Amino acid sequence: MPQILIPIVVPAIAGGLCYLVPRRVKGVREVLALAGMAWALIASIQLFSRYPLAFTRPWVTLGNLDVQFDLMLNHFSAFALIFATLIGLGVTLYSMSWLSEKFDGRRYYAFMLWAVAATCGALLSNSLLLLLIFWEVLTVILFLFVNLGSKKDEAAAGAAKSFVMLGFSDAALFLAVALIWVKYGSLSMKDLSIFVGDAYSTWVYILMMIGALTKAGAMPFHTWIPAAAEGAPTPVMALIPAAIDKLLGIYLLARISLDIFSIGPGLMMLLMIVGAVTIVGAVLMALIQHDLKVLLSYHAVSQVGYMVLGIGTGIPIAIAGGIFHMLNNVIYKTLLFLSAGSIEKQTGTTEVDKLGGLARAMPITFIVTAVAALAISGVPPFNGFVSKWMVYTGLVELGARGFNSYWIFLIAALFGSALTLASFVKVLYSGFLGQKPSALSHVRESSWLMTIPMIVLALLCIVFGVWAKWPIDSFINPIVHGAVGTSVSGVVDLGGGFWDPSGATGLIIVGLIVGAIVLAFGKFSKRRVGRVFIGGTKPAEHMDAMHFTGSGFYGTIRDMVPFKGFYINAEQKVFDIHAVGGRIGDVFVQGLRSMHSGVLSTYLAWCVIGLGAIVFAVLSALLRELVAR
């Protein structure tokens, strides 16, 4: 079998075998899933050094369209394959401990393997039609996957909403593919080069952009992600919305914006506006959430804004920053969802108001969560800072080239990072640093099957920040150089680039050492500690009642003048395109309902009118045919 097929075929077959293994047989599914993911990862690593690589076979003929099973390995797809399969392997290992008896392991592991297989197929597809098929397969798998959640009502609602919104975007993508075939006569991505200079090409690009942005989760096509988070199994959120969908959505957006289409300032501005609105809007929603999974889902949306903003600038360093942020987001967002799953596994809840004081009981989970929180907030020296810094630098360069409104987008990006950090202060305090409720006195650290993937991802957050030159030169620079002809190899280097991560890390370490010394001296000083006066009652009786969580820190933000209107509109689902579409649909439904009066003669009249219209259309077509002859 050609090596390019292994990341697709092996997980697909392993998933089928997992589905066929009887439920009463223990351990076989886990071994099959782990082996399938590991094989796919090894093959992906081997493929990275072999691009460009092609595989083409005749498939099916549809009229004048000869559909081929056309795969093409380029640098972008090669590096995305590695991280798609790496995350798949980590989540599989994690699930071996997280999964409980109440879940159907047959379907769970089968869906996980099939999701990775479909992802690899989409990344490797050179044919737009083949990409669309794998794209739709992943949508169906997500629908089935979310339905596996233990909260049946929330899972069903989230799955339905995800399927409708992603199905709509898939339809837009299908229409774009059809329009490309009609006018340009090719579906090969490597052969297409479309200048966006008229309404036709503009609408084709916008349709493909909608498909990419919905998959990635950018506003206003984002609400399926928080809906899925309410009921989906936590590892599913770590695998698909946090990792796979970000890889695929931004991969397609970058391919159409940098390779397939040549877009002008208008569409670039549209991308930048979408990016800035997504950054600020989603992080404002994250601030007021009380469920950890829903909070993380809004942050998953917010981070997409940096990727879209970077690509939209058209500046090489910002494009590189957007793509690098895609990679970084896959790492730390997966880690955050796995951390949430670890908390959920040990405490039975993800409600931040019911948590507290877990740092001593779950030290590994606390440390990796803190690393991921600092990374997503853009705090140096972690990986999230480097990619955000590159986007900021690109925006400043855009201003130097004469774009006077650059500061609006720069402020939005910086403001988003500040609010992200504020949000995770709440998470860390409420979950780990606050007072532990008595109901959580039994909590212990998760098993090594769950902590190992989290530790690996936390280390990547550090390595890709401190030694950012390596991933940028190895993964990102060839993509940008191939697309715009400019190298970004020197932007992060020792003393020679815009940002010196190693030197900054040294300064941070020195600061931490000085702080530790000051803290140590403080330990030796004597201080008087008194009991809190609570009206003479016994403290033990009211300890849980006096449990103050971090969520209260941001309780007043809803009433602040700049944000009050935003939150009111959000509660009314003004920004939920699914809800808005439903309201518009209800108007048509009510109009049609008025025609269904229950009177038989009225129904017969409608049938006669419809039949007459059909007969008229057929006779008109026949008459035109006869006249033409």
Language-model region placement:
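Alpha-helical transmembrane segments and their helix-start/interface "positive-inside/aromatic belt" motifs
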Residues: 26-37, 158-167, 360-369, 444-460, ...
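Hydrophobic transmembrane alpha-helices and their helix-loop junctions in integral membrane proteins
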Residues: 90-106, 116-131, 141-446
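Aromatic-capped, Gly/Pro-kinked transmembrane alpha-helices
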Residues: 241, 471-507, 516-629
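Hydrophobic alpha-helical membrane-insertion segments
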Residues: 34-48, 169-175, 369-380, 453-473, ...
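Membrane-helix interface motif
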Residues: 49-58, 179-187, 379-396, 466-487, ...
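Cytosolic juxtamembrane amphipathic/interface segments immediately preceding
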Residues: 66-69, 353-354, 437-442, 494, ...
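Hydrophobic alpha-helical transmembrane segments
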Residues: 71-85, 201-212, 406-417, 492-515
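Transmembrane helix-loop-helix hairpins at membrane boundaries of multipass inner-membrane proteins
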Residues: 1-6, 16-110, 185-196, 477, ...
